[in-house]
């Protein structure tokens, strides 16, 4: 079987992106962990980002947000 006739990955056949597939796999692994490793992994799951609004071509003060998958 050549590379051009190889089977499509099952995540692509299911209509998913690789990022979506890897996020689901990571969540399953985190749910299988025992304490204290489970709570450590949950603390690393949070996402920190900043949002800046622009008015009249000038950036206002950015606000920092923290989101989790809860």
Curated annotation (Swiss-Prot):
Highest taxon of the lineage: Eukaryota
Keywords noted in UniProt: ATP synthesis, CF(1), Hydrogen ion transport, Ion transport, Membrane, Mitochondrion, Mitochondrion inner membrane, Transport
SUPFAM superfamilies from the UniProt entry: Epsilon subunit of mitochondrial F1F0-ATP synthase
A GO molecular function held by the record: proton-transporting ATP synthase activity, rotational mechanism
One of the GO BP terms on file: proton motive force-driven mitochondrial ATP synthesis
CDD domains in the record: F1-ATPase_epsilon (cd12153)
Subcellular location per the Swiss-Prot or TrEMBL entry: Mitochondrion; Mitochondrion inner membrane
Record's GO cellular component terms: mitochondrial inner membrane; proton-transporting ATP synthase complex
Pfam families: ATP-synt_Eps
Principal cellular location given in the protein's record: mitochondrion
PANTHER family: ATP SYNTHASE EPSILON CHAIN, MITOCHONDRIAL, ATP SYNTHASE SUBUNIT EPSILON, MITOCHONDRIAL
Family recorded in the similarity comment: Belongs to the eukaryotic ATPase epsilon family.
Assembly notes: F-type ATPases have 2 components, CF(1) - the catalytic core - and CF(0) - the membrane proton channel. CF(1) has five subunits: alpha(3), beta(3), gamma(1), delta(1), epsilon(1). CF(0) has three main subunits: a, b and c.
Free-text function comment from the UniProt entry: Mitochondrial membrane ATP synthase (F(1)F(0) ATP synthase or Complex V) produces ATP from ADP in the presence of a proton gradient across the membrane which is generated by electron transport complexes of the respiratory chain. F-type ATPases consist of two structural domains, F(1) - containing the extramembraneous catalytic core, and F(0) - containing the membrane proton channel, linked together by a central stalk and a peripheral stalk. During catalysis, ATP synthesis in the catalytic domain of F(1) is coupled via a rotary mechanism of the central stalk subunits to proton translocation.
Descriptive protein name: ATP synthase subunit epsilon, mitochondrial
């Amino acid at each position: 079987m050549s590379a051009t006739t190889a089977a499509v990955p099952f995540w692509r056949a299911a209509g998913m992106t690789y990022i979506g597939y890897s996020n689901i796999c990571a969540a399953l692994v985190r749910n299988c962990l025992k304490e204290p490793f489970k709570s450590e992994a949950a603390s690393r799951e949070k996402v920190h980002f900043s949002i800046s609004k622009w008015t009249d071509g000038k950036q206002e003060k950015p606000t920092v947000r923290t989101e989790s998958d809860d």
